Amino acid sequence: MINKRSLLASFINLPYSLFITFKGMYITLRYMFKPKVTLNYPLEKNPLSTRFRGEHALRTYKNGEERCIACKLCEAICPAQAITIEAQERDTDNSRRTVRYDIDMTKCIYCGFCQEACPVDAIVEGPNFEYATETREELMYNKSKLLHNGQIWEEAIDLRIKKNSKFY
């Protein structure tokens, strides 16, 4: 037996139900013909800002000599205390250079203070954001890893520093 009240209620709600259904279809069709905003990530990438702060790198001069003068300003200014530097004097010209330069990337907050504090632009944050690792120990960067990053990203880092020189 059909309940008369439920049958009456369904007829009363029919125009509203049709309205809501067609409104949803209209919205769906409208968005169907708009340009897509999602990217097929591994194949397509968004352009990065020139001020993006990614993986750290130590830079060298054109002759291959490292820029870091072991002033330890980056170590002192790091709010996360992620940087550890040990310095030693050279015998040739009595200038200081780093013996050990470590960054614990698990502590780093990517604030960019180390880059701003460096008087010789030795430590920079490059454009690389894809550096996932399988172990935590791989995120403990030593001097050789940082110098290697500097060699890989030197052109991109130079371009970014030139574009952003008025902001530093």
UniProtKB/Swiss-Prot annotation:
The UniProt entry, under Gene3D superfamilies, shows: 3.30.70.3270
Question: What is this enzyme's EC?
Answer: 7.1.1.-
Cofactor comment in the record? Binds 2 [4Fe-4S] clusters per subunit.
Report residues binding [4Fe-4S] cluster 2: C78, C108, C111, C114
Which prosthetic group or cofactor does it need?
[4Fe-4S] cluster
Can you tell me which residues bind [4Fe-4S] cluster 1?
C68, C71, C74, C118
Cite the entry's keywords alphabetically. Answer: 4Fe-4S, Cell inner membrane, Cell membrane, Iron, Iron-sulfur, Membrane, Metal-binding, NAD, Quinone, Repeat, Translocase, Ubiquinone
Say yes or no: keyword Ubl conjugation present: no
One GO term of the cellular component aspect? plasma membrane
Its placement in the membrane is given as: Peripheral membrane protein
Can you provide one Gene Ontology molecular function annotated for this UniProt record? quinone binding
Every copy of the 4Fe-4S ferredoxin-type domain together lies at 58-88, 99-128
Question: Could you tell me where this protein is found in the cell?
Answer: Cell inner membrane
NCBIfam families given for it?
NuoI, PRK05888.1-4, PRK05888.1-5
Matching entries from HAMAP family are given as: NDH1_NuoI
| Subunit comment | NDH-1 is composed of 14 different subunits. Subunits NuoA, H, J, K, L, M, N constitute the membrane sector of the complex.
Q: Which PANTHER family match?
A: NADH DEHYDROGENASE [UBIQUINONE] IRON-SULFUR PROTEIN 8, MITOCHONDRIAL, NADH DEHYDROGENASE UBIQUINONE IRON-SULFUR PROTEIN 8, MITOCHONDRIAL
Protein name per its UniProtKB record: NADH-quinone oxidoreductase subunit I
Q: What gene does this protein come from? A: nuoI
